[in-house]
Amino acid sequence: MAAGVEAAAEVAATEPKMEEESGAPCVPSGNGAPGPKGEERPTQNEKRKEKNIKRGGNRFEPYSNPTKRYRAFITNIPFDVKWQSLKDLVKEKVGEVTYVELLMDAEGKSRGCAVVEFKMEESMKKAAEVLNKHSLSGRPLKVKEDPDGEHARRAMQKVMATTGGMGMGPGGPGMINIPPSILNNPNIPNEIIHALQAGRLGSTVFVANLDYKVGWKKLKEVFSMAGVVVRADILEDKDGKSRGIGIVTFEQSIEAVQAISMFNGQLLFDRPMHVKMDERALPKGDFFPPERPQQLPHGLGGIGMGLGPGGQPIDANHLSKGIGMGNLGPAGMGMEGIGFGINKIGGMEGPFGGGMENMGRFGSGMNMGRINEILSNALKRGEIIAKQGGGGAGGSVPGIERMGPGIDRISGAGMERMGAGLGHGMDRVGSEIERMGLVMDRMGSVERMGSSIERMGPLGLDHMASSIERMGQTMERIGSGVERMGAGMGFGLERMAAPIDRVGQTIERMGSGVERMGPAIERMGLSMDRMVPTGMGASLERMGPVMDRMATGLERMGANNLERMGLERMGANSLERMGLERMGANSLERMGPAMGPALGAGIERMGLAMGGAGGASFDRAIEMERGNFGGSFAGSFGGAGGHAPGVARKACQIFVRNLPFDFTWKMLKDKFNECGHVLYADIKMENGKSKGCGVVKFESPEVAERACRMMNGMKLSGREIDVRIDRNA
């Protein structure tokens, strides 16, 4: 409340200046001496300040001194009790009540505790005596005197620490998931972020220093770029002229915070706007936990920025273990969950588990330097093996012949354990992948892949091409041994029927887990959208000549050699007995509705139009909406000879889904005119009725992309629309 009083006084102090600038009548005094009216002027200003102070809050304040309050803190309240019922109970048992606030969580549910204020100290003491241990809906209330708000503050801190909020350093995730772009934004005060996390922030912003010709329509037009504006007002003086002050109310609190970030300090008609939260939108009461600065060692004056996101320090020990993204979220919520979760998917505690741990390394801060080192070592080993291929291949044929009996033994206890492992592991796939989706939301460091991949150019891929050429020659000498291997695999697979039968049953249980993958994969799509920086183009261009040489090597490995591998022995009788029919119908059909829309949304946002390939390696060119994929890279992937299409032309048309069915093309055009000049708008119709989707064409790709950023997720008549670039335009 003290903050509200100061804000009201500040606004009142600026009002005379506004009136003078707008040409409001001012009382002059001759020869610089204060006249009789001039002597009354300070008294009038003081009265105006007092009036504004009384009017400052949206609740009745019974105390002249706002720091002196007679409050009681009540806990163990049944969760279904509303604040009005609690107020009636206290009024009946104690007497007059001036203020009741039931503490709520982010979803609007009661936390089981409340703050009750009284006008007199005797009422506060009586409440602690009478209501303590009073049974309400079978639960004994716990009532304590709390004049300084200390009990309420501790309760809030305890609740927020349980949910991962305060006490975890700046940026810790609170009761509402706040994007890092807001947490680390210097334009937004910390108290506003804390109130937003607690779900106790209003949706109204206060705008000052407006040009006097700005009306409410212009104000609404400007601030609509930050969100859905419910109401916009310009404050006027007694003559009906603008005072250069406005108030804008949004549909959601986060839109108001976004407006502060977007417009505070920006010029409107050559005047910088001052945008802040309206004092009535800030949370009431002083029991909200204040921000506590990080405790520093004695004698240390301060610290600079760490190397992690948002200036957070990183843990070097975690980096060496491959979990460097542990500090990605400002509260230490990181990517180690991915490596750990994937490692548990199939109960893979054996050799597979060791391999899957590398997923944690890849996710950890996109540690591309480590990948470079691994690839370099692998390529060197491949080159050495290929150089020995002339004599070594001949020696390896008897070894491959001896693989047949070994493969027979694979299908016994090993395959049965695999079935059991899959059964336990697949049940956890859904929850683990959900955690992957949440973490991918925070993968702001994916944008650094471009610069990291650029370092992969001179990795020694030339050695890889020459090695593959030698592998082609070696494969020609392996044929007879592989034939016998095929025979052994045929017998082995016949014994795999029973374990695979059990795999079919476990995959049926995957349905519910995969259904939870939808939102996660959609969030992964948003992150993947940032994975095509310009740095990737320059590095991949260097791979063009190398890929040409790899094509000739791959040709030598195909056709004749693979035909001699005896794989036909694996078909018919053995595969028919594998129980794969259990994997259809009930299980895989449930995977379709969950993965279909989600994968569609995620892959479309990746901006990749992947084709096949032609000539020696692939048939069609890779089309990428973003990135500089020209030159030799396009030539190698575009087939032998000629230049591939390379960069796809950016589209100027967007596709809008989930529109209200009463929305017309004119309404659609008017709505998207806020983003830029619309050339064409249309609603898709079927049998004369709207299909709930439409297209909008702009004059440039940049305007189309801006429309996607501004309008995607906006609510129209209660429906959240989906806006994306129309690839088919």
Curated annotation (Swiss-Prot):
Glycyl lysine isopeptide (Lys-Gly) (interchain with G-Cter in SUMO2) crosslink, residue number(s): 17, 37, 68, 82, 87, 126, 133, 142, 144, 220, 276, 284, 344, 380, 387, 650, 666, 684, 691, 697, 715
Residue(s) carrying Omega-N-methylarginine: 495
Modified residues (Phosphothreonine): 664
Residues bearing PTM Phosphoserine: 29, 85, 203, 364, 376, 396, 431, 451, 467, 480, 527, 574, 587, 617, 632, 636, 700
Region of interest (27 X 6 AA repeats of [GEVSTPAN]-[ILMV]-[DE]-[RH]-[MLVI]-[GAV]), residue spans: 399-607
Biased composition (Basic and acidic residues): 37-49
Stretch list, region Disordered: 1-65
Chain ranges of the RRM domain: 70-148, 203-280, 652-728
Cross-link (Glycyl lysine isopeptide (Lys-Gly) (interchain with G-Cter in SUMO1)): 697
Record's keyword terms, sorted: Acetylation, Isopeptide bond, Methylation, mRNA processing, mRNA splicing, Nucleus, Phosphoprotein, Repeat, Ribonucleoprotein, RNA-binding, Spliceosome, Ubl conjugation
Record PTM text: Sumoylated.
Keyword Transmembrane helix in record: no
N-acetylalanine carried by residues: 2
Xref: InterPro entries: HnRNP_M_PY-NLS, hnRNPM_RRM3, Nucleotide-bd_a/b_plait_sf, RBD_domain_sf, RRM_dom, RRT5_SRSF_SR
Disulfide pattern: none
Functional description taken from the UniProt entry: Pre-mRNA binding protein in vivo, binds avidly to poly(G) and poly(U) RNA homopolymers in vitro. Involved in splicing. Acts as a receptor for carcinoembryonic antigen in Kupffer cells, may initiate a series of signaling events leading to tyrosine phosphorylation of proteins and induction of IL-1 alpha, IL-6, IL-10 and tumor necrosis factor alpha cytokines.
Name of the protein this chain belongs to: Heterogeneous nuclear ribonucleoprotein M
Source organism (scientific name): Mus musculus (Mouse)
Gene: Hnrnpm
